[in-house]
Every structure is written in C-alpha cells, then in structure tokens.
Swiss-Prot record:
The modification Phosphothreonine is found at residues 180, 183. The modification Phosphoserine is found at residues 76, 176, 391. It comes from Bos taurus. It comes from the Eukaryota. Disulfide bonds: none annotated. This is Inactive rhomboid protein 1.
Amino acid sequence: MGEARRDSSSSLQHKKPPWLKLDIPAVVPPAAEEPSFLQPLRRQAFLRSVSMPAEPARVPSPHQEPRRPVLQRQMSITQTIRRGTADWFGVSKDSDSTQKWQRKSIRHCSQRYGKLKPQVIRELDLPSQDNVSLTSTETPPPLYVGPCQLGMQKIVDPLARGRAFRLADDAADGPSAPHTPVTPGAASLCSFSSSRSGFNRLPRRRKRESVAKMSFRAAAALVKGRSVRDGTLRRAQRRSFTPASFLEEDTADFPDELDTSFFAREGVLHEELSTYPDEVFESPSEAALKDWERAPEQVDLTGGALDRSELERSHLMLPLERGWRKQKEGGAAAPQPKVRLRQEVVSTAGQRRGQRIAMPVRKLFAREKRPYGLGMVGRLTNRTYRKRIDSYVKRQIEDMDDHRPFFTYWLTFVHSLVTILAVCIYGVAPVGFSQHETVDSVLRNRGVYENVKYVQQENFWIGPSSEALIHLGAKFSPCMRQDPQVHSFIHAAREREKHSACCVRNDRSGCVQTSEEECSSTLAVWVKWPLHPSAPDLAGQKRRYGSVCHQDPRVCDEPSSEDPHEWPDDITKWPICTKSSAGNHTNHPHMDCVITGRPCCIGTKGRCEITSREYCDFMRGYFHEEATLCSQVHCMDDVCGLLPFLNPEVPDQFYRLWLSLFLHAGVLHCLVSVCFQMTVLRDLEKLAGWHRIAIIYLLSGVTGNLASAIFLPYRAEVGPAGSQFGILACLFVELFQSWQILARPWRAFFKLLAVVLFLFTFGLLPWIDNFAHISGFISGLFLSFAFLPYISFGKFDLYRKRCQIIVFQLVFLGLLAGLVVLFYFYPVRCEWCEFLTCIPFTDKFCEKYELDAQLH
C-alpha cells in the first residue's frame, strides 16, 4: 500500500502544470487559553460603552465538559471545634466572621471615640463616618486585552484604586452623581472584588424595625391624637423609589455585567446634573469640547498613561477603574482635552429608569452600623478616625455586621418585671438618706405595755427595705457562708439560753422563758432545775438545765424521750414537741401556765428573742408559734429566705452572687439601669454579639459582688453595679485596640476616665457599692481583652492576640480564685472599708454595718 501511494503522488507531480504553485500553510498550534478572569470579557456586553459601537456577534465555541470537582476530606470534630473556637475569639486566619467583626469595630470606633484620622476618612469614603468602603483597598492585577479586540492595545493602569481617593468637595457635599464620560469607559474587573458590588455578595434586605421602636412610634401617635395606620401611610408615601437594599438584588441578577467608568469635567458638573437621561449618560457638549481644543498647551492624550504623581500633588487621587483612551479608526487621533477626572462607579444593572439616585438612596436607607471605637459615646465625645489606615485594617472594618441586642432586651425586661413585683409585694420603705424611727406602745412578754422603737434605714431609690431585699436574694454574706461573727453571736445567745428557766407569775397571768435576772423574785417564781422539786430524772440523776415553759420530756409523745433516744440534759438541744400526752393539769407549774412569749427572729443578723407576737410584728420579725426556745429555730434561714440551707447551721446560698444582678433597690435604681442598658450595653452588644456581652456582663457582676461580700459582709447589696462597670471597661479596651486609627486618642481616654471617676464618686452615696464597681471594672478589663475580638494590624498582632487571650483568661481565673479563697477560708474584717463606699456626712446618713450596731 505504501509503495502504491508513492507511485500515485509521483505521477501527480509529473502531471502538475509548471505555472501552478501550491502554498500549503503550516499547522498553527492552538492559542494559549485566556486567563480565567478575562473569560467574561469575551462577551459583547462588557465591551460596550456609549460612544463605542458594538462588536459583531461571535460564533460560540463548542461547550466543554465541566471538570469534576476535587474531592475534599470532611473536617473532623476536633478540627471543627478548633476552627469554631478560633472564629469565636477572632484569631482565625481565614475567617470571614473575623473580618466582619473588625470592620464593624471600626464603625463603632468612629461613632464612639471621636474623629478618625483624616486619611482614614478619605480612604474609607466616609463623609459622615457611617459608611465604610473597601473598594480602595483592593487593587486587582492589570487588565490585558489582546490586540485582536478592536485594535485595542495592552492596558496597564497603575492608578486603578477604586473610590477611595475623591475630591474634597465630594466629602463635604456627600456622594456625587455619575459624570458624563469624555472617553469611552471600559469594563472594570475591580467591580468584581469591590465590596460595593452586588456580584460579590448575596442580596441583603433591610431588617425589620424592632418591637421597641414600633411600640414607641405607636405610643407617640396615640399621644398626638393620630392613628398608627395614618402615620404609617404617610411615611410610606414619602418614598417614590425603591430603597437601596432592594436595588442590590438587581445587581446580583446580572453577574455577567461589569461596572463602567465615567469621567467628566469638573466645571460642567452642576450644569448637567439635571440633564442626565434615565438610561444612558451622554458625552460633554460640543461647546465644551471646542473650548478645550482652543487651549494651545493641550496635547494628545490618546493612549497615554495617567500621571500618578501629578494627581497626588493636586490631591486628586481619583477612584479610577481599568480604562483606556481609544484612538479613532482610519485617521489621526482627535486631541482629547486634558481635564480633571472624576469617577463614580455605576453598575450596569442600574441603567434603568430611576437608578441615577441609587447611591444617595443607599446611604439614606442603609441600616445604621456601629463603627469600631466610634459608638454612642464616641458621638457624644466627637471622636474620629485618623487620616491614614492600612488597607488590611479597612477590610476588617467593612466586613463587620451588627448583631441584634437580644441580651439587652431580655435583661431589661427581667429587671423591669422583678422590680415591679418586688415593689408590689414588699411595699416601699421610707424615702430618704437617713434612718427612720418608729415609736409605739406594744404589749411585751411581761404582760405590760412598753414604748418600743423600731429603726429602719431609708431608701432613696423608692423601693423595698433592706430586710425585704435580703429575702428576695440580695448579696449578703451571712446567707452565703458561715460568717464567724454571726456564728459566735448565735452561739453566745444559746449559751445564755442554756442557763435560762421558766418564769411563772404568781397571779397565774402567764409564764415566759427568761434568765434569773429578768424574772422578778417577788411577783414570779423562777422554776430552775434541779433546785425546784419538779425536776425530772435523767440516768438516775436530776437534770441540771431547765425548766422550759410548755415543754417537758415526761409528757411529750412526739418525739418521745425514751431510752436510747432520751433528750439530753442541755435544753438547747431539745427538739420541738409536736404532741403532748397530758392535758392542762400536770401538777407542773411550767406546764400548767399560759405561755406569753415564743421565739421571734428580729433583724438581719440572726438575733432571736422570746417575746409576744405583737412585739414581733412591730419589729418586722418572724414569729415561731410552734417553738418554745430560740435554739429550736434557725433565724438565718428565716432572714435569707429562698431555698433552705442543706445544713441549717451552715448557710450556702452562693447563688446570690448572680441572683442579685437582676434585683434593684427601687424604681429609680431600675430606671438608671435601663437607661444604661439601652444606650451603652445595647450599643456594645450590636458590635460584639449577645454571647460575648453576656459572658462579660455576668462574670463582671459576679466578681464585683464577691469582692463586695468580702469587704462589706453585712450590707445588703442589689443591682448590676459590677456588671455595668465591666461594660464600661469594654469601652476602654475598645479604645486601646483602636488607638492607632483615632485622631485624638488621648482626648477620648480622658473623657472616658472622667465618666468613670464621676460614677465612682456617685458611689459614695448609700446603697451604691464602690467595691463592686472597682472589682467589676478590673474583671471587665481582663474579660474584654480575652473575649472581644478587635482589629489586628498585621500577622504579629494576630499572634499577640492569641497569647493575650490565654494570659488574660488565666489572670481572671486567678483573680476569681483569690476572691473565693478570701471569702470562704480567710474572712477579712475591714473597719475603714465602709468609708470607701459611703461617706457619713451625718450620724444617720450611712447605715451601720457592724454586727451589733442595730439590735432594734
């Protein structure tokens, strides 16, 4: 076969005419595949502009089969936990949540801590410092267009920086409208990476109004005499165009269209704003072009590169997109005017009627965000960013999204509800700053009326008394541990009761358990065992302690005194007799009399008296009808309330450390807390989220209450004082972390310090605990450094953050452990500590916190 083919070809060569010449072209290798980022540019829609004709449609290339996706190993549980923990602490390397947090932190900083540095305002495109742009932070690689595309040459635009460098009047007058292009605009790849572009994110709708805001608007409408529906309709009619949050959906629907750059002369901006058509932007007028052509110094700029140094010298670092100047086909290039260029990035999807005001609408209806370091306090103190901020920092700022302040709303609801219930159930104590005294004539245990006085500390917060607050769950050391002084006080009272006996009056008017000194030898008989003949036997011997009014081991059936469960000789260890076998006549004087006094727990220190019910009610005590001795009742259990102790002799209500955070001393106290929560706490929670703020709030409050319980053990303390100062510490930490981007950080620091010192001075009044303030502030500092992610200024700062999390967590745990050891194992008695929390301007201004200062 091969020989036959060679013979046929040689025969054809001989038959070829001499004038015939065959030129067979060589095989051209296939062209290299275009870069992936240039694939969309093959479509005609991206190469269109107003003054450039459309390219003829090309034959589509055959469809290629998609590649199979690369299989990836699923993360293990350990890796998932590790990555989630890193994201939560804000130290992840490739975490989108970290970037969102950091961008949001900058917004909060701009609102709370004053002005930013001027270069930051210019680079972030923040005329009002409430909208952070990242377009200027991303400079995509140069755009290369092959010579086969309409005669275009390679374009390298080194000044394509985005929107950040804008004219000064733009920052003053707000966002400028798109200008008419002098030269045809080109497709922009920067719009794909721009944070303002809709191609890079899913459409986001505006969140609904909060319930509190709608309720407040409804209440305002009712006060003004209008209906809520009318007000809603009037507000709805004011909007004649679609909000920006819904316009973003149009952008997301056309991912194959790029942004177009438009350039305009500065002088004709305001004249042509009203003449823009709805669908397209036209070129400048012919008269304007003729004026530019008359200038002799103008040169042909077609195809020339933009002079970056000249723009920088004239402070016109413009947000240039990838573009070029195209030379006219088939002739000499027409001279193009050398003008000042301005640019507004306009999405092609916005080329519809009504879209020319999309940017002002977007800023008008966008939900207000909290810049990092510039929150509510920053607006009050006029804080601003510094002029220059690194692009990495700006990227972190813009990625931050606000959180819903669920914890603030829940906490405010609980505080309000508990305060209302406490005031309704326990009433209101006398209002004032001193002590209130009540004197009345009351029948006591001796059978005669006596003038008695009841002393009560006034409450200027308009709320319950200190005894009622302790019963509700206030911070009170004797209810949380076995206080040494309270325990010794109760033990001494029981020793006195051990040597007491029943005092029976001679006129048979009654009997009461008293000591020998309190029983009259002429009007009564003190039935003391074993001197009295009614003494019973115990193990063959007379009992030495007793007698007890209306209680005798010989006549009690439940519990009975039988061997081997005989009642001991010590009467303070006798149980309560619930059933007696004998009637009214036992031939024992201490059993046949009418008892006129029973145990009554008075005050907050565990003091017990055997007295009448009338006196006990007057002293606001707890009367025990079933008992006959004070040793048979546990007054601290009555005073503390809540859950009973596991061991009646050992108080164990440690949960008061966090339970008291939800109580308030009165209505005014609750209003102050609500105002703080709806301003400072709500603002911080929108930045950090409910979980971080809840941890800092609760742990700071617990630490503050623990320190207060150590240094002021006998004072009933309620309210989130430590928690509030812990939240204030978050503001200091936020200020320290945003120190590099603030224009005047020292000014913001001294303003915050003045606020804290004022609140600390306010804590010198009664019912306000400065020990909780100090400890809560210190613990809040440690917790904020550990749990609040912040802006990182480089890789070293990221590693430092990880070490900082571990160190401050260990420091806080050490502080908490030290306070626990001091509270439970090494109690501290500090006599001068009360002057740090309340200055006694008068003798009755501050409540006396000593153990036996108030025996009522």
